[in-house]
Amino acid sequence: MCNKQQCISILSKASPFIRKEFGVKSMHLFGSVARGENTEGSDVDLFVDMPPKALRVVALRYYLQDLLGTTVDLIRNHSRLDSFMIKEIERDGICIFE
């Protein structure tokens, strides 16, 4: 499990590969890790803008879980996001890359 600064550092360093391999246009960290409130059982919440190709989304999630050493909850940017989720991302979100 990584803390906020560790997650930001790891993801920032991996961003060229993530962009190229998975077609991710932007990534934001949000949730308990972004707020500095994570516990040992917390997952890492990431909001990404990427093409809607199911296999790539699944592959990215597995890659990120291996990279960060914990469970990753990957939320893709799309028009069906509920307003609560959008507000949480806007409130807590930390831009990793755009």
Q: How would you label these PLM feature ranges?
A:
Residues 28, 45-47:
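Short, well-ordered beta-strand segments
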Residues 1-26, 34-40, 50-98:
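Catalytic core of pol beta-like nucleotidyltransferases
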